[in-house]
Amino acid sequence: AIAKRLTMYRLRSKVEITLPEDLAVQLHLAAPAPQPGVQVTLALGNERWMTIEIAQVANADSTETDADRAADFMQRWALAGITALQAEITADTTERFVPQMIGWDTVTPGGGISFGKGCYPGQEVVARAHYRGAVKRHIEVACFPAADLVAGSEVTLPDGRTAEICNIAVRHATETVALLVVGNQSG
């Protein structure tokens, strides 16, 4: 989806945008290599932290446990983002929300979007919503009993309002936490 979206910006350039099939992430520490099992914590700002547990050192074999740790890390990362009201747009939620609905205009420093002269898809809608103050939805966190919730789907809240799911994370085996885009209450 990223490569497809980036092709909109190549204009008349004769450039082909693709992503490698074997994309991987590596962490290089400017210190002696820690042993497997050691945790490294990084502060990312806005009350959000990332803890990396060293699962393997270069050339060590991967195990099923590594996959389980990666899945657990991704759930904890998603939960931290939801708790901090930091929406992440995925393939299921692409082009579903105006940036102000998910709080990107309040990201610090300097805001997460520019309202100045620009040329990107949807810029007119984003600027109009900003200058008219006409954003009719906002983000909230909600907890649900463990359920098969899907980002991009609609749910009905206990107070009768409907909301669209932006992000989800499993907190416990019995509870799912979601970042919702909810209509503003009138009145």
Question: Can you describe what each PLM-predicted range is?
Answer:
Residues A1-G187:
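Basic, glycine/lysine-rich polyanion-binding surfaces/domains
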